[in-house]
Amino acid sequence: MSTYLVFGATGNVGRRVAERLAWSGAAVRATSRTPEAAKLPRGVEVITPDLDAPGALDDVDAAFLMWPFHSAERARPLVDALRRRVRRVVFMTGGGTLPAVAPEEQPNPVARWHATVERLIERSGMGWTVLSPSTFMANTLWWSAQIRAGDVVRGAFGSLAVTPIHEDDIAAVAVHALTGPGHEGRRHTLTGPEVLTQAEQVRLIGEAIGRPLRWQELTPEQERARLLADPGFPDGFVGELLDGCTKMAAAPPPEVTSTVPDITGTPATPLSVWAAEHAADFGGDRR
């Protein structure tokens, strides 16, 4: 039986890819830095992300790959290892990577790293599919501490519009691309079903937890100071984040794509549903 290799299998998307494959009866090998704590479905083989380890790529037909590293220097040896044994790779890109734009011309460091990995995969000789998702709905968890503490979320760019996507919708498309025909050599742009500002997202979370919430606008400089004071936020990314938000706020609103329903046959999940699923994370009752 062919085996599917899932990288980042304890992350927001990788876990759901591994679960969906396992529930379908497929053989799954998943990578985790802490295999003993992975808590994946029974039958999933969990290994460390060391492709030089004996048996790591045995019988692997296709791989789901994401890139969590803060550089692209590990990409070439990883792609080289995959291309010697694996027929197909589905890569989840990120950072607002622009298609058909050279890595060095991408708009930010994260996009440059992801574009570098994309280029290596596309030139590897493997069958490939690139998934380019919009903002994860899970990113709203950045506000969870503020919401648990009160009824106001403070931040800059409250009018910034995005098309947030449920992580399980990304996973559903990934499984189709891993297991089905018609996806090789294609880039799938994935969005949720609606365009929402940050302030509107906060309102919908409030509705999900049964408590009115409101957005309080900060200036970019106030937001910079807030992020720099947050021990959980890397100082080196504060400037890049604010610059990126400034550019996004000045750009035309994003468009909703039909890729998720076109591929999966199921409508993309709205934020209201995701927020209800995660109500407990914001101090509400899980529904």
Predicted features by range, described:
Residues 217-219:
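NUDIX/MutT-family hydrolases
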Residues 2-41, 52-55, 60, 66-76, ...:
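Oxidoreductase cofactor-interface core, primarily capturing Rossmann-like NAD(P)-dependent enzymes
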Residues 60-61, 265:
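An amphipathic, basic-hydrophobic alpha-helix
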Residues 44-45:
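A detector of mature, structured extracytoplasmic domains
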Residues 49:
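Cofactor-binding loops of NAD(P)H-dependent oxidoreductases
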Residues 221-287:
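A hydrophobic C-terminal alpha-helical subdomain
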